[in-house]
Amino acid sequence: MDSSLSQKFTLAYASLLGVGGLMGYLKRGSKISLVAGGGSAALFYYVYTELPGNPVLASSIGIVGSAALTGMMGSRYLRTRKVVPAGLVSVVSLVMTGAYLHGLIRSS
């Protein structure tokens, strides 16, 4: 199966979120990080699987999820000034929001 570039970026994004949640749990014992990172990773893995067959649905879900993460982690960055994880996730999420918006426009 040949993956599109958008699928590869989505899979990398899901992996980043999942690994980040796991790291938060392992380093600080944060169950919230584990659940939030795992849940976000699962959502974006679903987007990854839906992109080839239903790009409008997948991109729509991707926009909502990545925009929510941009807002939440951006707010956290402004409050804590910690680049990792809040700054990193907010910037990557902002880029992914734009990518999903581009995909949605292109698919419509």
UniProtKB/Swiss-Prot annotation:
The chain crosses the membrane at residues 32-52, 55-75, 85-105. The keyword Transmembrane helix applies. Keywords: Membrane, Transmembrane, Transmembrane helix. GO terms for cellular component: membrane; mitochondrion. Gene3D superfamilies: Transmembrane protein 14-like. The keyword Transmembrane applies. It is a multi-pass membrane protein. It is found in: Membrane. Its main location: membrane. For all TMEM14 proteins, 4 hydrophobic alpha-helical domains are predicted. However, NMR structure determination of the human TMEM14A showed that only 3 of these helices are membrane-spaning while the amphiphilic N-terminal helix is probably located at the lipid micelle-water interface. This is Protein FATTY ACID EXPORT 7. The gene is FAX7.
